[in-house]
Amino acid sequence: MSSSLSQTSKYQATSVVNGLLSNLLPGVPKIRANNGKTSVNNGSKAQLIDRNLKKRVQLQNRDVHKIKKKCKLVKKKQVKKHKLDKEQLEQLAKHQVLKKHQQEGTLTDHERKYLNKLIKRNSQNLRSWDLEEEVRDELEDIQQSILKDTVSTANTDRSKRRRFKRKQFKEDIKGSDFVKDHRYPGLTPGLAPVGLSDEEDSSEED
């Protein structure tokens, strides 16, 4: 009963307000009796929209943080790679200079010691360096060439020493007054031993 009176009172009050509005402000939309419920619904929708907007902002901030972190890591890797590439290119240039000095025979003692160490750890360096395939192949070719030239130079020196010794031996023989027959000491080649005539040689052969 009270609910019905309340609804009636609301309706009457709404009618009075609508009448006043139509007189004072013609064209203004009339107020509906259930306007309070509509306001409540609109308030709930506003709160829901606000919550969704806040969540969206939080997600965006989180994504921005992830993007910044990822960009920072990428930049750090690029700087590290650039530094490594620079060191490797400097190393390659140094090896090329050493190769040139090796071919020209102008290696210093310091360069020679460095080459010996370089050849020993050649395989380890090639595995640890993060080079492009072309640069790695170039380094390996240079080091193999240096090793080959070093071995070839040592073999050439030994061969020269052997040829010199043979030449010296022949010159010593030619410089002697006469060459003794090793079968008959005291005789020169072509002479028969004492007590052995040509006839005896013939009879022994028969």
Curated annotation (Swiss-Prot):
The keyword Transcription applies. The modification Phosphoserine is found at S197, S202, S203. Residues 178-206 are annotated as: Disordered. Keywords: Nucleus, Phosphoprotein, Transcription, Transcription regulation. This is Regulator of rDNA transcription 14. InterPro entries: Rrt14. Pfam families: RRT14 (PF17075). Involved in ribosome biogenesis, probably through modulation of rDNA transcription. Signal peptide: none annotated. It comes from the Eukaryota. It is found in: Nucleus, Nucleolus. Belongs to the RRT14 family. GO terms for cellular component: nucleolus. Residues 197-206 have a biased composition (Acidic residues).
